[in-house]
Amino acid sequence: MEINIIRGQNQIGGSIIEVSSKNTKIILDVGSNLDDKEIVVPEIEGLFKGEAKYDGVLISHYHSDHEGLATKILPEIPIYMGEKSYEIHKITREYIKKEYLKEPRVFKSEEQVSIGDIKITPYLCDHSAFDSHMFLLECEGKKILYTGDFRSNGRKFFQSLLDKLPKVDALITEGTNLSNDKIGKINLTEKELEKRGIELLKGNDRPVFVLMAGTNIDRIVTFYKIANTTKRLFLLDTYAGQITATIGGNIPNPRTFFNVRI
C-alpha cells in the first residue's frame, strides 16, 4: 500500500489522505480548512471533479475539518460513515440549512468492510465527536492505522482500545495537542470536570449557564451528572435536544429522561 498526504501535513484539520494498493484507491477524510470563511473545494481530479478514480471515502467523524467537503465528492464514489455520526451530520446540516449526505454506507465498530482489495476495520475511539472511529487498513500483507482525531481524557477507557489494536506497519495521525503539558495547559478528564462542577455548585441555588458544543456528547453527559447530583433541572437548547433525542440510549435526552427538558 502507498500513502499520499494530499492535504493536512502542515496544518490543523482539513485532512485529505489517499491510500492505494495495486487495484484500489481510497480516501481517508475530506475535511474543509478551519480558516476558510467559505467552503473552498480543492482541485483534486477524480475526487471532486472529472471522472471518478477513487473506490471509496472513509469519514472518521462529523467535525467539519474531517468531513466538511463530503457533499462535494463526485456522486459515483461511495462514502462510508458511522451510523450515529451520520445522524448527527444530517441533523447539524439540516439545522444550519446546508446540504447533507443522502445515502452514505454506514459501518459499525469492529465490523470489517472491504473496498476493493483493502480490508477496513473501524474502531470506536474517544473524542469530543460522538461515534468517532479509527481505521485499520489491511492489504498486500501490510497494516496501516489511521487514528482520525482521538483523546484519552474522555469517558471511554483508552487502554481497552489500545489492547484491541494490532501492531501495524504505518501510523497516520495528527499531533496538534501533543505538547500541551509543555506549555502548561491542563487537560481535565471528564470525570475530573464533573467533580469540580459538583464542588462549585453544591450549596448554590442560582441558575447556571454553560457554553459548549451541542454535539459534544461526553460534555453533555458530564453536565447532566453535575445537574443531577446538585438536584437541578437539565435544560438543553433545541439543537442539542434534537441531537441527544436522536442518539437516545443512555445519553441524557428530553425524550426518555424525566429531568431533561428543552
Give each language-model segment a name.
Residues 1-58, 64-218, 222-225, 229, ...:
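His/Asp/Glu-rich metal-coordinating catalytic cores
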Residues 238-262:
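A contiguous, basic/glycine-rich beta-loop/short-helix subdomain that forms a polymer-engagement track
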